[in-house]
Amino acid sequence: ECLALYEELEILLYQTTSYTSLAVSVDYTDTEAQKKDAKMTALAAEIGSRLSFIESEIADAPEELIRAAMDKTGRAKHYLAEILREKPHRLSAETEKVLAALRPVFNAPYDIYHMTKLADMKFGSFTVNGKEYPLGYSLFEDEYEYEADTDVRRAAFRAFSDKLREYENTTAATYNTYLTQQRIMAKQRGFADMFEADLFTDHVTREMYDRQIDLITEKLAPAMRKYARLVGKMNKLDRVTFADLKLPLDAEFDPRVTIGESREYVRSALSVLGQDYADMVDEAYDKRWIDFARNVGKETGGFCSSPYGCNSYILLSWNNRMADVFTIAHELGHAGHFRLCNGAQSLFDTNVSGYLIEAPSTMNELLLAQDLL
């Protein structure tokens, strides 16, 4: 009964914190949204601190008692198994309570980085051959990196990099703070190092991690170097710089895509996953799960948030490019995954390893590519 009530409260917290944090992601310059999110974050930390005794008391119970409870319970079985797995690395109940209260402080490096990047940086414009071009994070990443005009593309890269360089010390100090925090917590919890702690959280062994890095270095790197040379050849570049790597291989074919056309492409590609999945694609467009607008202060790239008990919310900056269509297919992979996951399992079973979480979304990109071919 305790865990059932605890899950209900955690679901409510998940939904409310998602509501306030997503409002900030849409526009980091919205001070009212920031205030609401800060209040909700503080409240969630206070509640988490007050309720931290639940996991501490479970972890302090004899292992045989926890395993007996796992055999009798349904929705909480994996939750109890995870507490048992983490038991050797838990600290005292009082320490865990304090750490839960300090969660907003632990999140500070992430928050500072995003506020610097999305609220404080003012890119202005740059000029090429007497013409002035506006510049921004999304404009650079989603537009100028694909620009066919080499002078404009490379000038945009220089202007963008120059602005980032103005904040390099702040960014470095923020990242160093995060690493210091992670190193200290890893040591306090009895891990050999930060790597072991992070991989433990993701249910991944060091051997798996090293194998992936080695595979990328040994197998992917040569192919990517060959690809870079091919980009230079097909686009008739004097040399290939970092500013040129997003150019299409076919310089003569870079079609613009409307939002309506993106729906047709994505639905066609993903219909192979069944009618329910195709219906979800339609629902995402019809019920406005997707925030397409490109505005100042908006989170860059694309992401999908799937609060338990709610539909998913997808954020991206639409630029009428085929790359955006792939982003939607990718993020709908997360939406489909968590629709099934959340619908069939306890909230406590939805914290998925990063090694698994990107599989459905990457598969959707492959399905889209296959369908286009």
What are these regions (language model features)?
Residues 1-252, 263:
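A well-structured
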Residues 252-257, 290-310:
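Catalytic zinc-binding patch centered on the HExxH motif and its immediate surroundings
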Residues 253-261, 272, 307-329:
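Short pre-active-site segment immediately N-terminal to the catalytic Zn-binding motif
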Residues 260-289:
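Amphipathic alpha-helical domain-onset/packing element
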Residues 313-317, 344-354:
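Short beta-alpha connecting loops at secondary-structure transitions
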Residues 328, 332-336, 360:
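Active-site His/Glu-centered metal-binding helix of metallohydrolases
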Residues 333-347:
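Catalytic Zn2+-binding segment of zinc metalloproteases
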Residues 352-373:
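Post-HExxH zinc-binding segment in Zn-dependent metallohydrolases
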